Amino acid sequence: MIGKAGKVARWLAGAAMALTLAMNPALADDTLDRGIGSEWSSLDPQVNFDAAAGWILADAYEGLVNFDPDGKIVPGAAETWDASADGKIYTFHLREGLKWSNGDPLVAQDFVNGVLRTLNPDTVSEKGYYFYSTIKVKGASALANGETKDPLTLGITAPDDRTVVIEMETPAPHILDLVGAFQFAPLHSPSFDAGGAGVFIDPSKVVSNGAYVIKEVVPQSHVLLEKNPNYWDAANVKIPFVKYHVTEDVGTELKRYQAGEIDITYDIPLADMERLTAETPDEVRVFPSTYLIYYSFNLSNPDLANIDLRRALSLALDRDVLENKIVKGGATPTLSYAGGFDPDYKGPSIAEADMSQADREALAKE
């Protein structure tokens, strides 16, 4: 996403919201069949960067915290945590008796090892920036850039088996969102050291710590997950199996849902959205996401390089008409990069936000 002010015209927050057709009333068996659209690029939690695998990995791996159905942060592998007065140091206290899916003890150093692998240049992971840019962990940039290989320089440590300490260069209250994602998945070093990255797609070798464990991987077809009996909250995991189906064409996936082949789809063609909402209102679910759609301008064009012109275009664009009359995808018009997904987030003060569209257009003409 482009981050320089004035380079883009923001227009819709969550315009590509995950649109969910509710699960069929009764599962045909003990398996929840979910559509994920395109095939995953990787099932390696320290490498994956696509949404398709994200659903799978979120079931197979758990970070230090988790999220409830409303998106609120709740305890995950860590049952409690606290922050220093200056907000630069977060200390997470793991639950007692955590285990990997194979029964091995899960300890704090496993989380540290996961981050170290992400930052290792040999891993060729695009996710290192989470740690040296998004939350600016001490020592993360030097490790990612190959300036040092000393793991002791990283500001993420495990003083004992049940404590993870994260030390940052600057305060980052959004750190909890990061450590709750599979980006902060722990690494089972014994299996990885024995089999390398190949263990993540080999059901006979993969070891994870989430509610489910990968049991079957069939390229261009599906990934089957089975309930992990060693998960700390296994008693509350009610569905024995989850099967993720690949369907490259969004229209075809919708047909598979309507035929009862899958129970949930997150891909609905925009052309069908209005009709489906009217015909099956009890099945369509629209929920907010952090996805943002925006216009990006070619700054090599002398006219578009003029920041005043770009600002005028942004002011003149009627985002409400664009969403409600044209796109009709359930998005929320926005004037900033950060939308309203996080109820605790206080956005920037934008003067134009209190203007009518007519006033914005008048200002654009100036």
Each language-model region and where it sits:
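Short, well-ordered beta-strand elements
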Residues: 30-41, 79, 89-92, 111-114, ...
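N-terminal lobe/hinge region of extracytoplasmic solute-binding protein
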Residues: 35-85, 116, 205-208
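Gly/Pro-rich hinge or "lid" segments in bacterial periplasmic/extracellular proteins
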Residues: 151, 162, 168-237, 241, ...
